[in-house]
Amino acid sequence: MKAKRITAAFKHLALTLLGLALLAACSVSTPKPDAPPSTTPGTYAKANWKALPAVSDSDLQAGFAAWRGACPRLKSDATWAPTCAAAANIATTPSAVRQFLQANLDVYALRAANNRADGLITGYYEPIYAGSLTRTAKASVPVYGVPDDMVSVQLDSLYPELKGKRLRGRVEGRVLKPYDDAARIAANGVKAPVLAWLTSPMDLQFLQIQGSGRVQLADGRQLRIAYADQNGHPYRPIGRWLVEQGELKQADVSMAAIRAWADAHPARVPELLASNPSYVFFTRGPDSDDGPRGSLNVPLTAGYSVAVDRNVVPLGSLLWLSTTRPDGTALVRPVAAQDTGGAITGEVRADLFWGTGDAAGELAGHMKQKGTIWMLWPKGVALPKAPDPAN
């Protein structure tokens, strides 16, 4: 994160204003802003390997490879470091992978607060949008880096029980105020570097929702853009606003439907975008053919990396996912928890990364399926402690 950490001079100020600022919607999220914890005790139900639906050998190998590829990032993680070390030299044959998993990991079914086993499985992707490095008549929508005047408080430095939570705002005199919401930023701009210029405000909105993307330049180059920080306001789905306005039915909400509505109602696009006060700031990503980096800071693997609620599933965990594709065909495979998302909250909840470009976007945009999830957890290691919803 490139947002400035608040200095010691402001520490007492942050303590005084913490409650007020939280009420004023300075969110305390981590990459891709997280909603408040929704977990309750009893999230993890002990199961066994026989309870897991069968997967193909190729999916087993690919899911294991996606998880093991993140192990260098987990060397200092007390939960996963020993298992990662044991996995380093395991052959990737289906039999070797199965034997390793069953010998080292226990199975826990994720359960919602009402003890339901099924939840929502959605999809996301890395979009590619036309743009420019300079402002032009056609490309006039800025992609901002982190603002110079936005300060950030890592709250666990003040309150250990708020580990991973962050407060963002702007200091005016000796007062810490909420940072501008999306509508004010769109109208007035911010004191931030402009990484690129896009041709459509809807492209920018979808780039912010996906959390990363690429800008296609006129000379054929592609500029990779990655999540850097967020303005501290809560994420509110623009599709929900369209439903509330009577413009779309809930069952019809998709990226394609939202885009079609915006194309048909250009005068109302600012109103649509203002319904989501959250605003994402970006940084330049590495020029690589690998997937974009998620919250775990490892390249995502198309079809085998998922975003999760980190209050339920710690990043780096291996999951067993059973759901369907948008066309209704079965999708069962191990997946790696390597990202988070503002809309990804709850116990039985995952967002499957589909890859880069339009084909991946078509799958992601229509992915709104029921599914069940099992967490594979190292033997002998205590389960994650469900957070107190009061916090």
Predicted region positions:
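C-terminal soluble interaction/assembly domains
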Residues: 27-29, 45, 56-63, 73, ...
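Secretory/export targeting leaders with adjacent low-complexity proregions
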Residues: 43-286
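Short, low-complexity, disordered segments immediately C-terminal to signal peptides
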Residues: 30-40
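Bacterial N-terminal signal peptides that target proteins for export
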Residues: 2-14
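C-terminal motif of bacterial Sec signal peptides marking the signal peptidase cleavage site
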Residues: 23-25
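Non-membrane alpha-helical secondary structure
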Residues: 14-15, 93
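Sec-dependent N-terminal signal peptides
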Residues: 16-20
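Intrinsically disordered low-complexity regions specifically enriched for long asparagine
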Residues: 29-30, 80
